[in-house]
Amino acid sequence: MNRGFSRKSHTFLPKIFFRKMSSSGAKDKPELQFPFLQDEDTVATLLECKTLFILRGLPGSGKSTLARVIVDKYRDGTKMVSADAYKITPGARGAFSEEYKRLDEDLAAYCRRRDIRILVLDDTNHERERLEQLFEMADQYQYQVVLVEPKTAWRLDCAQLKEKNQWQLSADDLKKLKPGLEKDFLPLYFGWFLTKKSSETLRKAGQVFLEELGNHKAFKKELRQFVPGDEPREKMDLVTYFGKRPPGVLHCTTKFCDYGKAPGAEEYAQQDVLKKSYSKAFTLTISALFVTPKTTGARVELSEQQLQLWPSDVDKLSPTDNLPRGSRAHITLGCAADVEAVQTGLDLLEILRQEKGGSRGEEVGELSRGKLYSLGNGRWMLTLAKNMEVRAIFTGYYGKGKPVPTQGSRKGGALQSCTII
């Protein structure tokens, strides 16, 4: 008689054997078709990031099963925090303020640990106010956020969920929770968020560029573009000048959504290509670094696949512009005082519009990474001799984009607060 396999009857088999069995079975289940479970390149990339998976859904919809699959997939460096463990009944949070306080304290403690890269929060998360608290915590500890909702066929069917949920909630109880989960929760913006390693590599390249440019004789002749008034200056520290720098990991914005209020945000978020790409790993190509009196950034050359995620209406400074799609793709590396990060993309479009008009500027020499061009009006472009490739996860930024106290795992560091730009 074939008794089949069981962990109990085959104690001599290594754990990896059973992990492969479970992962191969997951590939056949439509409710587990997520890039972070199915795409090994994405799995490897996420292990280089700090990611908070926030599960959302009605009781009985399959959140806990999905949470366990995520933990099983990533294993080491992963922790799950479940509302069930704190005896929190799904519904209004007011009756469980002490329980949520303990949950948040434990979640924050995990965020502070250096050995944890993946955090999984299992709760209904149907209230905007609650989600905003979690997004602020993610900002504080510099975690990227991935919102995950079960794909089970019954996830919004209160009649079926009544039978499946462990809390014995009635169909009416479930219907009260449903409105907050029927609509997608849109971020402040979507984009590609670089891994920690890629962020550090690009940030370092940007800093070397600023140091070399600041010492270049051609730049010294044009200092008046960066120094106010008639203040005499023979040299300037561009690293200090662009002191308003993105904390944590760098990113390349695709669509500014303003939580769904921006024009075209809902339509953008409903695209099939976005839904399939959300939480997926990509490799971005950097072809140039640039400086203007207001910003410094990296130009991103998007592939055909990546261009599918690029909005069709963001590559123009004026209605008559006809720049190629993806022209504005960039990564902000720093801004001058009182300059917002949105200016970086506008500066890049100005440079590319000038190039299209036939003026690439004057080649003034070579730096360690490529040729330096002076474009006039304090604008400089370093065309890389060898393109840089950076790894990134496509997701959303859901926080407020305002300064919050940061508590990274590194000791020291210049940044005392986190401003997402």
Swiss-Prot record:
Record's InterPro entries? CNPase (IPR008431), CNPase_cat (IPR047325), Cyclic_Pdiesterase (IPR009097), P-loop_NTPase (IPR027417)
The transmembrane segments are none
Q: What is the lineage of its organism?
A: Eukaryota, Metazoa, Chordata, Craniata, Vertebrata
- Lipid moiety-binding region for S-farnesyl cysteine? 418
Q: Which residues form the active site?
A: 251 (proton acceptor), 330 (proton donor)
Q: Which GO terms describe its biological process?
A: adult locomotory behavior; axonogenesis; chemical synaptic transmission; cyclic nucleotide catabolic process; oligodendrocyte differentiation; response to toxic substance; substantia nigra development
Q: Which organism is it from?
A: Homo sapiens (Human)
Q: Which Pfam families match?
A: AAA_33, CNPase
Job of this protein: Catalyzes the formation of 2'-nucleotide products from 2',3'-cyclic substrates. May participate in RNA metabolism in the myelinating cell, CNP is the third most abundant protein in central nervous system myelin.
Q: Which residues carry this modification: Phosphoserine?
A: 6, 9, 170, 359
Instruction: Quote the protein name from its UniProt record.
Output: 2',3'-cyclic-nucleotide 3'-phosphodiesterase
Q: How does it assemble?
A: Exists as monomers and homodimers.
Residues recorded with modification Phosphotyrosine: 110
UniProt subcellular location: Membrane; Melanosome
Q: Where does substrate bind?
A: 253, 332
Membrane topology is: Lipid-anchor
Q: What is its EC number?
A: 3.1.4.37
Question: What is the catalytic activity of this protein?
Answer: a nucleoside 2',3'-cyclic phosphate + H2O = a nucleoside 2'-phosphate + H(+)
Cysteine methyl ester modification sites?
418
Q: Which disease is it linked to?
A: Leukodystrophy, hypomyelinating, 20: An autosomal recessive disorder characterized by neuroregression and loss of motor, language and cognitive skills, after a normal early development. Disease onset is between 12 and 18 month of age. Patients show poor overall growth, microcephaly, feeding difficulties and spastic quadriplegia. Some patients may have seizures. Death in childhood may occur. Hypomyelinating leukodystrophy with subcortical and periventricular white matter abnormalities is seen on brain imaging.
Q: Which UniProt keywords apply?
A: Hydrolase, Leukodystrophy, Lipoprotein, Membrane, Methylation, Neurodegeneration, Phosphoprotein, Prenylation, RNA-binding
Can you tell which superkingdom this protein's organism belongs to?
Answer: Eukaryota
